[in-house]
Amino acid sequence: MDRLYLAGFYTLKFLIFILPSSLRNLLAKFLAFAFMKLKKKRFHVVMTNLNLAFGETKTKEEKLEIAKKCYYNFAKYLGINFILNQNTTKQKILKQVVFKNEHFLLDAMKSGRPIIVTTAHFGQWEIFGLAVAAHFGPSSVLGRKLDSSVMDKILRANRAQFDVELIDKDGGAKDILKALKARRIVGILVDQNTAPKDGIKVQFFGKDVLHTPAASVLAQKTNALIINAFIYQKGENLNEICFEEPIDISTFDKEEAVQKATQMQCSACEEMVRARPEEYFWFHQRFKRFYEKEYKC
């Protein structure tokens, strides 16, 4: 299987580098169309998510249009642009982004407290991590290893050149605490469904979902500040990274702190998704824990 992944990766890489930018966009459209038509179960997940999120507030046609744009962005962001950014430089990455409300992060760094940046599978989140490290300093990202070991090595090598440390969420607690103690910016993607033992119930688009409390628990344990941040398209080849006001969990009632801080993270994600639904990664079964039957084909 690793050989198949590797062959596909290098074939796509060859095509991308020999094609002009206009044809790369056509390639992204083709890949998006093919993925949407061939992976029908995944398309059902996307439409189920859109129905659960927007209900009757959007028409079937509007939801289908969001889905099509989501597939295109997936092909462009995680396919073409991911490959184009292999072995890139900090200067080239920073030319692709502008920062909004960066004073929230800068002031938090000046405070000397640990910092946890939470985000979602939204926009070009791969560039997000590289750009933050390039502009603000070393960071550590909590995540899951890829199923393909060779692709995981490629991903890690790409991030390592920006001093972005990848920490496996399975058994990575000590490494995360070490990173926070060293005052590395710690990034966590917090928008996926979790196993019942790993999540707490919050509201997302007016629906019950499970949400990881990892950032909230770590913040309570280490006195860290939590900053929600998201990346989204600003122009044809430009993205904006927007930071929100820090969440200081130490100011909350201790018994309610984790629940409140986690809901705030989920609400920030919802607000961003409502504003730009086509940039969200709708492929996850976000509502599965409480709406499992809706996902059955």
Q: Where in this protein do the model-derived segments appear?
A:
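Non-catalytic C-terminal accessory region of glycerolipid acyltransferases
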Residues: 38, 68, 107-110, 134, ...
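Generic alpha-helical secondary structure signal
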Residues: 3-6, 41, 45, 127, ...
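Catalytic core of membrane glycerolipid acyltransferases/transacylases, capturing the structured
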Residues: 111-170, 193-199
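Hydrophobic alpha-helical segments typical of transmembrane helices
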Residues: 11, 46, 70, 128, ...
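Short, flexible loop segments at the rims of nucleotide/cofactor-binding pockets, characterized by
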Residues: 91-97, 144, 162-167, 205-206, ...
